[in-house]
Amino acid sequence: MESIEQQLTELRTTLRHHEYLYHVMDAPEIPDAEYDRLMRELRELETKHPELITPDSPTQRVGAAPLAAFSQIRHEVPMLSLDNVFDEESFLAFNKRVQDRLKNNEKVTWCCELKLDGLAVSILYENGVLVSAATRGDGTTGEDITSNVRTIRAIPLKLHGENIPARLEVRGEVFLPQAGFEKINEDARRTGGKVFANPRNAAAGSLRQLDPRITAKRPLTFFCYGVGVLEGGELPDTHLGRLLQFKKWGLPVSDRVTLCESAEEVLAFYHKVEEDRPTLGFDIDGVVIKVNSLEQQEQLGFVARAPRWAVAFKFPAQEQMTFVRDVEFQVGRTGAITPVARLEPVHVAGVLVSNATLHNADEIERLGLRIGDKVVIRRAGDVIPQVVNVVLSERPEDTREVVFPTHCPVCGSDVERVEGEAVARCTGGLICGAQRKESLKHFVSRRAMDVDGMGDKIIDQLVEKEYVHTPADLFKLTAGKLTGLERMGPKSAQNVVNALEKAKETTFARFLYALGIREVGEATAAGLAAYFGTLEALEAASIEELQKVPDVGIVVASHVHNFFAEESNRNVISELLAEGVHWPAPIVINAEEIDSPFAGKTVVLTGSLSQMSRDDAKARLVELGAKVAGSVSKKTDLVIAGEAAGSKLAKAQELGIEVIDEAEMLRLLGS
């Protein structure tokens, strides 16, 4: 029994060490798959020896039966809110008030942090062990969410290091990264579950589950930003020093925390964070600025329910209210009909927004939207503005029902919605001017046939003047005909003709992608090209044969098969080949003949790579005999996870698929 106890202790210590490296230092030493293996080993041992399970074991993150309701926890030190400023002038006025209140013109340095858009929580550690956690609530009393907080892998169940206080209450923010938010909503749409309006609502909903097992399935994370109770120990006398100490004890702290020596440096920090905001991978709504010296904080004190030594400098709001003037319906290249709300223009996150997507008929029904309604609009990063909810309490009397069209608003063809699909489609195909335009724009795009200089406005004119009906017609254009277009001189026209001639030499994968087959993206097109090698073999493939290709299931296989079964599509392909479109003959190499760790494996790339582009990595992997797929499935052998890997990584972990990082990929590529 002694050796089992030792084994359990070693496993728990190892897992805590790797949790610290992953969540706090952002420098994992092992792939997630290895972490999962260690966790499984610990779980199996504890199952065999339940008497040896300890409350701080990493396996105990998912415990506790569902609660009937949350009990209350009274905060020993109130959780105060912060005053807000919204512009430079207001911040500079705050800075002056701080300077004026301090004695002897003391120099002030500022500790600046991200203002995370999540849920504030307090977590109490006694002798380094997590004993309770609570929401902010009203600042005096919060809800007991201990069981749920224990499921969050970023939060240590036990602190490590030296001089840990007997009682330490840390404050911080639980939040949901963007990739996790998208996966939760994607799963909800597929299963008919609740769709969240934004990551903050999703984080709050996940943390306030009565069943901790549900919380455990949500990819919540946490950053620490302050302290409440402190007994039986000491902390540094600066705010930054305290955060760095928390990090040493295993608590995650944002790596964007910055010490600023002046108000000018604070403003520079604010603008840099605002610029970086779309690429952070999680929502923030401003920066928090705190006097760094604890002695100066004490001198400044508090007013009402907020400290005088800190302020939240908010970004322009990402959500605003406005009215829906009308709902129009756009037709995409595959015939998908998308409702778009035409709005009373409103500034959201610094941008004037007059349109917002409504996705599909189900979304309109879910929102209960009527024309004339007052709505909340959200715009986050580069995401297309969307309607979050209807303000039903302020619904005008003259609102009108949104009627989804039964005929295409462009060509008049029937609209159909296949059972099981959320999207309604125009059945007109290429007789529909809208589908024709969007199909041609896709065909000439950079990642398809890459026709330089042929922009959307040129395509619009070519279709409207009926110069072009199919992609093959593009290669019949002359400089003379193009010169007749608006803002197209002889030189520009000749440049487009030259670009079309150059585009005739392509690759089989690009050609397939350019055809615009439903559900066939770049990765799937590359997989089809690599597997079949020739157009003739692909055209003759059955649905069963198509499903042998990595990343191709029954739905994609059916779309590909139906595309090539359609005579008009085969005719367009024949015309394109007759116009001189061509690609190099395939070089067939059996995976068995390649001495490579990737040979014969189906590989998925996720996240961003720092040492090479995604395209270069794909090309190198294919050279070494790999089949690169675009999504994770049971057919996947290996996932390569770069920075900010999202739902694909989560799916790989769920399926138990091997995961390696970029460094390991580079090592194997060089071996």
Curated annotation (Swiss-Prot):
Domain BRCT: 593-671
This protein's UniProt keywords: DNA damage, DNA repair, DNA replication, Ligase, Magnesium, Manganese, Metal-binding, NAD, Zinc
Active site positions: 115
EC number: 6.5.1.2
InterPro entries tied to this protein: BRCT_dom, BRCT_dom_sf, DisA/LigA_HHH, DNA_ligase, DNA_ligase_AS, DNA_ligase_CS, DNAligase_adenylation, DNAligase_N
Binding-site residues, Zn(2+): 408, 411, 426, 432
Biological role stated in the UniProt entry: DNA ligase that catalyzes the formation of phosphodiester linkages between 5'-phosphoryl and 3'-hydroxyl groups in double-stranded DNA using NAD as a coenzyme and as the energy source for the reaction. It is essential for DNA replication and repair of damaged DNA.
Family named by the database record: Belongs to the NAD-dependent DNA ligase family. LigA subfamily.
PANTHER family: CHROMOSOME TRANSMISSION FIDELITY FACTOR 18, DNA LIGASE
Name of protein: DNA ligase
